[in-house]
Design a protein with these regions (language model features):
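Active-site bordering "gate/hinge" segments
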Residues: 2-213
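Conserved small/polar residues in nucleotide/adenosyl-binding loops
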Residues: 248
Length: 248
């Protein structure tokens, strides 16, 4: 069992290691640091950025289970980092990401990720820390009498929608700034009921590769690697984005 998280999530990591070890698992773990990562990115040359992560590659090639938590001390830690540096670093992560996706797809690797409440994420959500804790734990239904039974109930309800959507071939989404058609004929809908992402409550599929046409506008900002973009609009033709716009 591989356990990974930012160092701010150490209490979660500690408890997971304890319970997994008691259950008989052989545990490996990795605690990351935003400060250390910043220095690594800032002072690496192109070859070093693309070198990859030997720890992740080695572990994910062999692990049976990967448990991870999201949460850091600073949601904007890499906002001012050059986008090209981040791009080259992502290229270096391709090998371990391939191990992850291939082994997840084959069933060799089981994964589950969850949110760990942090002060920075509470601030991002415009909540006090205690409010954010209640929000996260409430989303996981951890305070109901029988969380497992409740997630099984949600799974059954979502499965009803999965069976309904499996009979559909096209989805047409229309709203303010959005008019897009998605071909899902022959695609399999997946019931996400807490076994991978936790908490969950999602039903998803993928479109036919050349079967998306129209435009979509996002009313909320897109945030990636600490960079925030407002007013995103994508224009899609035959499954490819042919134009993108943003306000900031």
């Amino acid at each position: 069992v591989f356990v990974s998280a930012d160092e701010v999530c150490t209490p979660w990591v500690t408890e997971v290691i304890k319970e997994a070890t008691k259950a008989g698992a052989y545990v490996e773990y990795k605690l990351s640091s935003q400060e250390a990562r910043e220095m690594q990115l800032k002072y690496s040359n192109d070859e070093q950025l693309r070198h990859g992560d030997l720890i992740m590659e080695t572990i994910l090639e062999k692990a049976d289970v990967w448990l991870s938590a999201w949460g850091g001390r600073n949601t904007r830690a890499f906002t001012n980092m050059d986008a090209e540096i981040l791009k080259k670093s992502q290229e270096g992560a391709k090998k371990w990401r391939r191990f992850y996706s291939d082994r997840m797809g084959s069933g060799e690797l089981r994964w589950c990720g969850t949110q760990y409440p942090t002060q920075s994420d509470a601030q991002e959500a415009s909540m006090s820390f205690s409010e954010y804790e209640d929000f996260v734990y409430g989303a996981g239904l951890l305070e109901v009498d029988d969380p497992v039974a409740e997630w099984k109930r949600i799974s059954a309800e979502q499965e009803r929608w999965v069976k309904y959507l499996d009979t559909k071939s096209e989805i047409h989404i229309v709203s303010e700034g959005t008019d897009i058609k998605v071909n899902v004929k022959g695609r399999k809908w997946i019931n996400c009921d807490g076994k991978a992402n936790f908490p969950d409550g999602e039903i998803f599929t993928s479109p036919v590769e050349d079967g998306v046409n129209g435009y979509i506008t996002f009313s909320f900002p897109g945030i990636y690697a600490g960079k925030e973009v407002e007013g995103i609009k994508l224009i899609v033709k035959d499954g490819k984005v042919i134009e993108d716009r943003k306000s900031t």
